[in-house]
From Swiss-Prot:
The protein's name: Putative dual-specificity RNA methyltransferase RlmN
Cofactors, names only: [4Fe-4S] cluster
Residues reported to bind S-adenosyl-L-methionine: 163-164, 195, 218-220, 296
InterPro entries for the chain: Aldolase_TIM, Methyltransferase_A, RlmN_N, RNA_MTrfase_RlmN, rRNA_lsu_MTrfase_RlmN/Cfr, rSAM
Organism: Streptococcus pneumoniae (strain CGSP14)
Annotated compartments: Cytoplasm
Length: 361
């Protein structure tokens, strides 16, 4: 199976071109065709020699993904189901924000983190995506708009799709290098956010990388007992270890950390939990931000329900009174398979039902 050309960073593209006996500037030409002109085949690269095009075709594919189901919401949110070369399925979501187009990408097929409220973890991790498969998600979103005559450019990226990004650390870092490169997509590092469920050692590594990409942490509970009950990752990286890593990140980078907090009715959404959260953040309050997330129900996790508006507001008000910067996140795509992983999970469920029906008519 040939890799995607998108799996090369600009530096490794230059190295490959030199290995083929070509001049280094050919890498810039290929890069421009891929990321500025967004071609879908090597034959469209008209300023390259036939010999170089043949080498590209022999060693790479342009697009490793096949577009499947597309769901478009009334609010402009678009959810894509993509098929990988090995037949596995992933999801990508485009959201329209007041500041532009934001794409949420997937980094793994399935997830092993085991959050008990999340649709993404319904199917265990099968494998990591390589850099090219992550980049290709953005390229296909751009292609989707180009085919409709919509001259819109993706300018924000959130790495919050299926999987734990820091469990696929090197591929995710190369993804950042590719999309941030000023000769390519030129998406500013501060327009990119990566979210982790709390791999403390990787947070420390990330602090030392010196990149300007934003960090978000999926916290969802203010104490170990509650967090371990809804996120098994907390047993490996309890809050004390996690926050030591977060404090190291802040001290090293002087950058703000966003804390994701999903609102589960009468589970983690009480005023007492808000007070605990404020206490937990008191030493890093100036460089922390809490994102309160309304829960999207998942049929397989029917033990949870959405927090009523009054409980969300009481939680929000409590944090505000304690001086914690926070917001209730705007919802997107509530009229489609909204929770991350639902489109993929529901599609696979329907496929299994069809297979069973075919065997037992």
């Amino acid at each position: 199976m040939k890799p995607s050309i998108h799996s090369l960073t600009h530096q490794t593209m230059q190295e490959w071109v030199l290995e083929q006996g070509e001049k280094k500037f050919r890498a810039d030409q290929i890069w421009e065709w891929l990321y500025r002109k967004r071609v879908q085949s090597f034959e469209e690269m008209t300023n390259l020699s036939k010999d170089l095009i043949a080498k590209l075709n022999d060693q790479f594919v342009v697009n490793p993904l096949k577009q499947g189901i597309v769901q478009e919401s009334a609010d402009g949110t678009v959810k894509y189901l993509f098929e990988l070369p090995d037949g596995m399925l992933i999801e990508t979501v485009l959201m329209r924000q007041h500041y532009g187009l934001s794409v949420c990408v997937t980094t793994q097929v399935g997830c092993n983190i085991g959050c008990t409220f999340c649709a993404s973890g319904l199917i265990k991790k099968q494998r990591d995506l390589n850099n090219g498969e992550i980049v290709a998600q953005i390229m296909l979103v751009q292609k989707y708009f180009a085919e409709r005559g919509q001259d819109e450019r993706v300018n924000h990226i959130v790495v919050m799709g299926i999987g734990e990004p820091f469990d696929n650390y090197n591929n995710v870092l190369n993804f950042f290098r590719t999309i941030n490169d000023d000769k390519g997509m030129a998406i500013g590092a501060r327009h990119i956010t990566v979210s982790t469920s709390g791999l403390a050692h990787k947070i420390r590594n990330f602090a030392d990388e010196g990149v300007q990409v934003n960090l978000a942490v999926s916290l969802h509970a203010p104490n170990n007992e509650l967090r371990s009950s809804i996120m098994k990752i907390n047993r490996a990286f309890p809050i004390e270890k996690l926050f030591a890593a977060i404090e190291y990140y802040i001290e090293t980078t002087n950058r703000r950390v966003t804390f994701e907090y999903i609102m589960l009715n009468e589970v983690n959404d009480g005023v007492e939990q808000a007070l605990e959260l404020a206490e937990l953040l008191k030493n890093i309050k100036k460089l922390s931000y809490v994102n309160l997330i309304p829960y999207t129900p998942v049929s397989e996790h029917d033990q949870y329900s959405r927090s009523p508006k009054e409980r969300v507001l009481a939680f929000y008000d409590t944090l505000k009174k304690k001086g914690v910067n926070c917001v209730v996140r705007q919802e997107h795509g509530t009229d489609i398979d909204a929770a991350y992983g639902q489109l993929r999970s529901n599609t696979m469920k329907r496929d299994r039902q069809k297979a069973v029906a075919a065997v037992n008519p």
